[in-house]
Amino acid sequence: MKKKVCMVVPSFTAKGGITSVVNGYRNSQLTEDYDVRFIETYCDGSVIQKTSKALSAYLKFIYTALFWKPNLVHVHSSFGGSFYRKALIIEIASLSKIPVVNHVHGADFDEFYRKKSQKKKKTIEKIYNKCIRTIALSEEWKKNLAEIVPEQTIRVVENYGILQEDLIK
């Protein structure tokens, strides 16, 4: 039986780097080797569309945690609104005793963190320390994230990319 992975992502059509990475995963061997369920927490559009997408995602995630019971939750996070949307997912997974991998994409996450008050920094640390692993996109990001989570829990995985054959001929 395949292990179940719930991947928490932006909409497959949203603009941005996380979407490119996630769409690469969707079309890779990963979805053959694991039973992957994707939950979209963000979409491009109006405030109403974005809020509706997030609320719908929380309900889907609660249902998934309770009834599908994934072996792992893989959260793709960034700074700003992305952090806050994923924080609730991490909290729900933690309460459900589901391990979480936090894949941090935001190049400006360290600045987001550093500009926060001590109280908000502690909140960020508390949430991110509920994750069993944190994925950094470079050694430099690993150093920055080590201010928030224990360095031994951080792994460096460069952005996923697919080369188009016509570009390398």
Question: Predicted regions span which residues?
Answer:
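An amphipathic, basic-hydrophobic alpha-helix
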Residues: Y34, V47-S96, K119-K122, K126
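Nucleotide-sugar donor-binding and catalytic loop/hinge architecture
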Residues: M1-K4, Q164-K169
